[in-house]
Amino acid sequence: MEERDISVDLRALQDVIKVNFNDINQLLSAVTHRSYLNEHREADWDHNERLEFLGDAVLELIVTDYLFKKYPDKPEGELTAVRAALVNTVSLSETAEKLGLNDYLLMSKGEAK
């Protein structure tokens, strides 16, 4: 990957999440909010919305599979409620904050507040 003048250390982020990307540009896109690109027109990479869409679906599938196997006697309604409690904006935001992931996000000055 060519060196870019960005304010986030992608190598350090890979260490935090314990995943090494074959294509570091995917990670760069994953941490880039659309608002950042609006303020940095020179940026030549994508924002994270499409990856967010895919990630949400993958996360829901993984959690669903886990709950389905872990609780074979629970009815669908209970499993859905547990999944909803685990996979929601508040719980995911809290987890991201605990991991320090917010420090790696590229957002506009207005969004960062």
Enumerate the language-model features and the residues they cover.
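RNase III-family endoribonuclease catalytic core
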Residues: E2-K113
